[in-house]
Amino acid sequence: MDDTADAKRREDVFSINPVVGECNDSRINEICNRVVGEKELYHALEQADTDFAEGDIGAGTGTICYGLKGGIGSASRTLVLDGKTYTIGVLVQSNFGATRDLKISGKPAGEKILERIRKEECGSSAEDRGSIMTVLATDLPVSERQLYRIIRRCGVGIAKNRSLHRPRKR
């Protein structure tokens, strides 16, 4: 972390805010083995960039969403305010949901998928035992109150996908 901080300091970056989280991938990984160590941490820091792989990669490898393959994805928007361009970005790691609850474009799709899976005698997720992580980042010059209002939209997005969220207590 020291090397990263020193490098960023030279680039006039005044803050480094690493995000560490967990989404259970015990379906494919023995989590008690602690296979991620210092070497993997430094490799991840070296790979950090504005362009990055999404889907079934890295932290998204072992995720399951609605009983189907989950992953990691992002979306961002830019806006111009007082002649300056700012970005709002969201990173989501999906690892939740029972297949029967899946909707596509607002229409129930999970039961049809389950029927097909049952015909092929494959496994599926009958119940939701997962989690979801959402990270929102921005360089907008906002107050704490404004930032909290923006962040609350992450919970709304999660709720629209029939999952639960617990916002921090104020």
Where are these regions (language model features)?
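Alpha/propeptide regions of enzymes that mature by internal proteolysis
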Residues: 1-170
